[in-house]
């Protein structure tokens, strides 16, 4: 009982590792999320969730950054169900010119959100890790509210031009 619960999920098959539950599949799939959650029905919570998943890159940086952000939010979905108060979430991120919305959304749930780039990573690489510490969801938050809460944060960050047209966080028309 005192042993940590370790669960790994990957699209590719994994060799079995003693003491680790492995799940093959896509963590953006609701069926796989439910499979992960089934391992936490005993009331225990995770202290740490790590995601180093990345989409197949297209070479279109804006698209790659968007797809990576969706993986981070899929991980956040899992966190809202299983992460203990004060817990940590670490995820691979593609640092782009406009990460403000994603950081803002993560800061709704974590007291500290920082970006860390390992020294071993090439300087030219946009790959880094977002480190989210001290999980503390908004008061009254229920995991099923996640989409609504993230959407409201996104709406709050949108600006309007002089004609009332919505502008993205970079000031471009949406």
What feature does the model see in each segment?
Residues 17-19, 34, 91-93, 101-103, ...:
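Intrinsically disordered, low-complexity regions enriched in proline, serine, glycine
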Residues 4, 17, 31, 44, ...:
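Eukaryote-biased feature marking scaffold/signaling PDZ-domain proteins and nuclear chromatin regulators
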Residues 110-122:
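Conserved S-adenosyl-L-methionine
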Residues 4, 26-27, 65, 69-70, ...:
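Aromatic/acidic cage segments in peptide-binding pockets
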Residues 40-90, 94-105, 109:
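Mobile active-site "lid"/loop adjacent to the S-adenosyl-L-methionine
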Residues 128-174:
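SAM/dcSAM-binding transferase cores
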Residues 2-57:
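S-adenosyl-L-methionine
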Residues 11-12, 27, 53-54, 88, ...:
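Short, ordered loop/turn segments at secondary-structure junctions
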């Amino acid at each position: 009982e005192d042993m940590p619960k370790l669960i790994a999920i990957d699209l590719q098959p994994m060799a079995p590792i003693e003491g680790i539950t492995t799940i093959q599949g896509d963590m953006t799939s609701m069926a796989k999320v439910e499979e992960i959650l089934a391992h936490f029905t005993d009331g225990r919570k995770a202290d740490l969730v790590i995601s180093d998943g990345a989409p197949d890159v297209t070479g279109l940086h804006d698209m790659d950054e968007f797809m990576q952000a969706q993986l981070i939010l899929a991980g956040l979905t899992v966190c809202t169900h299983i992460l203990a108060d004060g817990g940590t979430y670490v995820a691979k991120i593609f640092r782009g010119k406009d990460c403000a919305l994603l950081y803002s959304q993560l800061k709704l749930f974590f007291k500290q959100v920082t970006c860390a780039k390992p020294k071993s990573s090439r300087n030219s690489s946009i790959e880094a890790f977002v480190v989210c510490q001290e999980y503390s969801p908004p008061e009254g938050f229920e995991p099923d509210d996640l989409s609504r809460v993230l959407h409201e944060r996104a709406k709050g960050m949108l600006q309007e031009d002089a004609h009332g047209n919505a502008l993205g966080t970079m000031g471009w028309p949406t």
